[in-house]
């Protein structure tokens, strides 16, 4: 018999459908939406999860398969990034008639604009045959609903910088940087301040890898007494 329903899906506005997957639009890390779609007594249990690579997508599919070991058809689809190449797209009908499950799921996932995302739809047969068209509609609808229940985020790269400031000036410099950022004068954020005996190191982030603008900002505040040093970058999640 089918497991109990996962409960009502949480509704989120759907974004405009782009011509191709947005490489920055995905699911929030840790979000695992789940829905139960019942059609003619068959249950289609859909789950989705962030997957940044094929290994993560396959591990998620295996975990869902283990969760429902008595299910007949855990069908799947995923789109994951491939550095320097087009995204990797895979789907599986897992025993359903060819083209009735995995491919419709993949097409639905593709049209959502999401990437780095895996979906598994597990069917528990209710005794009534749905036919080829019915299966296509059911797997497509289950995928649509679970993606609608997901928390979407847009990934953006923040570039890290450090600036060494004399202790006597560090408090003022930090305050001026924060105030200017709050006014929208620049996108430079103060993430942390490490205090030493004679100097403090400000950990800063910005949207640009170019040091020109941040150098100008620091020069104006410190009378040319501080220059930024690159400290790498990180990817952060912003609400989509």
Feature names for model-found ranges:
Residues 1-99, 193, 208-211, 216, ...:
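C-terminal regulatory domains involved in ligand/effector binding and gene-expression control
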Residues 11-12, 177, 187-212:
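Non-DNA-binding regulatory cores of transcription-related proteins
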Residues 34-39, 149-154, 187-195:
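Short, flexible, solvent-exposed loop/turn segments with mixed acidic/basic and small polar residues
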Residues 49-52, 163-167, 203-208:
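Short beta-strand-to-loop capping motifs
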Residues 67, 108, 120, 173-180, ...:
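Generic non-transmembrane alpha-helical segments
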Residues 101-149:
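Active-site beta-strand/loop microenvironment that shapes enzyme catalytic pockets
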Residues 153-169:
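Short glycine-/aliphatic-rich beta-strand segments at the starts of folded cytosolic domains
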Residues 165-190, 213-215:
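Short amphipathic alpha-helix segments
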């Amino acid at each position: 018999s089918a497991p109990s329903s996962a409960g009502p899906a949480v509704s989120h506005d759907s974004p405009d459908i782009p011509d191709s997957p947005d490489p920055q639009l995905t699911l929030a890390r840790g979000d695992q939406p789940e829905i139960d779609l019942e059609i003619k007594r068959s249950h289609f249990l859909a789950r989705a999860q962030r997957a940044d690579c094929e290994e993560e997508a396959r591990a998620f599919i295996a975990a869902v398969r283990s969760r429902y070991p008595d299910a007949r058809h855990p069908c799947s689809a995923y789109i994951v990034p491939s550095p320097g190449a087009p995204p990797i797209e895979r789907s599986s009908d897992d025993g359903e008639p060819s083209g009735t499950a995995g491919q419709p799921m993949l097409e639905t996932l593709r049209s959502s604009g999401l990437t780095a995302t895996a979906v598994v739809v597990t069917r528990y047969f209710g005794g009534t045959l749905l036919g080829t068209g019915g299966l296509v509609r059911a797997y497509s609808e289950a995928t649509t609903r679970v993606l609608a229940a997901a928390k979407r985020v847009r990934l953006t790269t923040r570039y890290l910088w450090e600036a060494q400031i004399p202790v006597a000036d560090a408090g003022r410099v930090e305050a001026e940087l924060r105030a200017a950022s709050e006014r929208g004068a620049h996108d430079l954020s103060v993430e942390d301040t490490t205090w030493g005996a004679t100097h403090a190191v400000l950990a800063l982030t910005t949207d640009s890898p170019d040091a020109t603008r941040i150098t100008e900002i620091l020069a104006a505040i410190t009378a040319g007494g501080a220059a930024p040093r690159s400290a790498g970058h990180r990817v952060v999640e912003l609400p989509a």
